[in-house]
Amino acid sequence: FLSLIPTAINAVSALAKHF
C-alpha cells in the first residue's frame, strides 16, 4: 500500500499543475 502513496501524490501534483 505504501508504494501507492507516491503515485497518488504524483497524480495529485499533476492535476494541480493543470489548475
From Swiss-Prot:
**Domain of life, per lineage:** Eukaryota
Where in or outside the cell it occurs: the entry states: Secreted
Cite the entry's keywords alphabetically: Amidation, Amphibian defense peptide, Antibiotic, Antimicrobial, Secreted
Major place of localization?
secreted
A GO CC annotation given for this chain: extracellular region
Q: In which tissues is it expressed?
A: Expressed by the skin glands.
Modification Phenylalanine amide, positions: F19
Instruction: Write out the GO biological process terms.
Output: defense response to bacterium
Q: Where is the signal peptide?
A: none
Of which family is this protein a member?
A: Belongs to the frog skin active peptide (FSAP) family. Phylloseptin subfamily.
What is the stated purpose of this protein? Has antiparasitic activity against trypomastigote form of T.cruzi (IC(50)=0.46 uM) in vitro but not against L.infantum. Probably acts by permeabilizing cell membranes. In vitro, shows no cytotoxicity against macrophages. Has antibacterial activity.
Q: What is this protein called?
A: Phylloseptin-N3
